[in-house]
Amino acid sequence: MVGTSGAGKSTLAAALARVLDAEFLELDSVFHQPGWVPLPREEFRRRVEAAVAGERWVIDGNYTSQVKDLVWARADTVVWLDLPRRTVMRRIIWRSLWRAAKRTELWNGNRERWRNFFSLDKEESVIAWAWQTHAATRAKLEAARADQGNSHLEFVRLTSPAAVRRFLRSAAPSPASGAPTSGAPASGVDQL
């Protein structure tokens, strides 16, 4: 599951993993250690490699320069959340406000800070990051989709919240066959 920050990758990936009865790994939860210290690259790669050694998994997060080679080599599908910037910004602003106000623990004791909410530095603020990297993320993923080295992957590009809901519904197995169906509601689909 890839896309710009705030697009809903983690929410969709967790819901998809439940629907598919697959393991779920949120790359941010591995990468961001206590105090927002990044996990050393070698250890990050080792943990991701162990996760993708499994039979069925859903992973969310970009980290293309660090682990794309490991994840995409074992993947069969890349789901790309390519939502409009206005949708992403609305979501990430509300999400960040909520998390900061509630002091929600994200990963390993880390929490969003109020001072970062107002920062224009993309290295400090996830809101600034989402705004400043939206176009570049889209261009990078367009290039990856066109790259013949990724021809073994099915790219599913979702460009609206309605498309996301339809995708998740289509991934839900039918009760009789276990095969995906477009008619069955999927757990968490209304939250997307």
Task: Describe each model-derived feature in a short phrase.
Residues 12:
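Hydrophobic positions on the alpha1 helix immediately C-terminal to the Walker A/P-loop
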Residues 1:
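Hydrophobic anchor at the beta1->P-loop junction of P-loop NTPases
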